[in-house]
């Protein structure tokens, strides 16, 4: 999940600066979850459900948001030094607003996954990425 929140000098977090996951209302969504470093837990508090994220294993969460609104999300697994900074927002919007938001991301060149170079544990045994080989 990474560090999502950047506190100010007094330790306060400006929630408007957190990353926001946009979801279309009344449309089934499937989220693919995996971890780049340690076990995390993807939690959207008002959805009353969380899903664990593991290294080297994809986990899926399928659901249908039924109410437009803004919701808080966070990592629910004590995962390390910056655990309390792993915060995000969720915005459930109309299908038209969702499509418009996706178009704005694409126009800005924001498509696809984050580069694998950001994987902290890309040399785990069995991944085939070790510089010394997997012998």
Predicted segments, located by residue:
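Non-transmembrane, membrane-proximal soluble domains of secreted or membrane proteins
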Residues: 1-135
């Amino acid at each position: 999940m990474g560090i999502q929140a950047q506190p100010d000098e007094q330790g306060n977090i400006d929630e408007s600066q957190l990353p926001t996951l946009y979801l279309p209302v009344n449309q089934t969504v499937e989220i693919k979850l995996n971890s780049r470093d340690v076990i995390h837990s993807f939690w959207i508090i008002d959805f009353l459900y969380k899903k664990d994220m593991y290294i080297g294993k994809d986990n899926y969460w399928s659901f249908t948001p039924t109410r437009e609104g803004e919701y808080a999300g966070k990592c629910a697994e004590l995962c390390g030094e910056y655990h309390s900074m792993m915060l995000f927002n969720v915005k459930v919007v109309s299908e038209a607003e969702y499509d418009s938001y996706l178009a704005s991301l694409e126009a800005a060149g924001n498509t696809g996954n984050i580069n694998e170079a950001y994987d902290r544990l890309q040399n785990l045994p069995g991944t085939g990425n070790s510089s010394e080989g997997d012998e």
